[in-house]
Amino acid sequence: MKHLAALIAGLLLTAGCGPKAITVGSRPFPAARPVFSDASGKALEALPAADGTIRLVFLEFPWCPACADVWRAVGISAKPFPQGTVRVYRVLFDRETVLTPDGRKEVPPLRPAPLPEGDGPEDPLALKVTTLTALPVEFREEFRVSQGPVVLLLDAEGTVERRWIGFSAGMSRELSSEIMKRARVLSPRPPGT
């Protein structure tokens, strides 16, 4: 009995160790250490400022067949709202796991990630997209993400309010509904901005 109690105590002490799951109600960013890099290569532990917009975090993985569908759903859901209502943090992973005769290996993506649709300067309804790259070792040691793609809806303080894993046919409708709820709370922008 004494050994069982010691085992349970040991398991409870180590239960908080290791990568955390990004769950609804958690506040993953800022992380304890840098887990992203921006376009300039600067390491970041937090998402860049979002100027009061509705924030979505899109964890996009290499060889992700559903990622194009998720991008389409995000674009469709944000289209009815004024430009700048939604900011998407696109987090790319620059490593993928491949199976080789020697076992599993982490390698750079075998093909580059395509740019999301509707992210061009010529598109007047373009989403505000900030692209970041996950630092492979640091992100994996800080967070546990077992499958993707993942879309997180954050509140103003950075707490995860909703999480979607994978793609579903009703995703754009769900996202649009969540944006609508939050867009009512946002103060109207002054004319001409």
Residue locations for each model-derived region?
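Short active-site neighborhood of thiol/selenol oxidoreductases, capturing the structured segment around
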Residues: 48-68
